[in-house]
Amino acid sequence: VKEIFGKTVDTGLKHGTVTIIKHGSGYEVTTYRIDGEYLDGRHPETVEFTPDLREDLKRRDFTINAMAYSHETGIVDEFEGMEDLKRRVIRCVGCAKDRFTEDALRILRAVRFAAQLDFVIEDETYKAIAEIAPNLVHVSKERIQVELTKLLLSDHPEKIWMVDATGIEEYVTPGFTEVFERELESRNSMDPLKECWAGIAALPADKSHRWAGFLRHMTAEQAVKILRGLKLDNDTIGNVKNMIMAFQAPLAVDKVEIRGLLSRVTEYQFLGAMQLKKLDGDETVPGILRLFEEIKEAGDCVSLKQLAVNGGDLLAKGLEKGKQIGDGLMYLLNLVLEKPELNKKDILLEKINQFKEK
């Protein structure tokens, strides 16, 4: 392949894979191979190349992924993958327990594919997931997180309930089982988990909204612990933390309270929290959003950046650098959050005198 095509990248020569670069796009080409033993529950110890396509296909995870195509011979489907596609079924190639024992990540992939494609998991494959679930200890938290995130970003994020139903949840990260336990305790319906996450699909399909939707009934601190355990990026963790905090904070249809909340979270996080409230049937959301738009239109100050004075102004008024200036700015911000009309430089400089006298 490297001789035939001028520009290639050695993406995995050990496994017989090179990437052809053509017209600015990359195309992976992999030699047929047979995997050796999986001693670590994730990767084969050895790889043996083979000219036999069937040998390559039978090492695949699921039948729908074990098909090949040639313009000369058409579809090669040794394991009835096309039939499973038609039936909308996730089924392992060969013995499901063997496939999951070889690579425990396949357990999460089965659940994720079922969610993404809105398929069902075949009975033997489902039983094997529950039996081999303890092997997930061999899978890195990053890889587990990637699969769960893909599931939550799919068209059927509500199928996260399958993580509990298959017994996977206790091997995800500390605290993860509590997410499901809390929902089971708080709901009396026949299908509490399915009911709880039924509306997540209505949230924007990004990591922050979907993870916040899933974790919204945990405390913000518990959510952070779970997400850090799964090695999510700091931006997502920060967004989820503040969305949940704002979602759970008591909030009246009142401009002072809304401005106060906006001073602690970003607009993106605030709107995300409102979507979480709406998800749980909070009838105050329309009124809150109406006042939020009025606050925006009026240009009300909700942050230190919007204050009509800055640290330099307070320094000139005789406040000491550091904590005193910081406390002074927060004092003024709190005044302005309650009465936006006070956000004028001369008024605030007069008000800071009251702060100095305290």
Task: Explain the meaning of each model-derived region.
Residues 1-358:
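Catalytic cores of the polymerase beta-like nucleotidyltransferase superfamily
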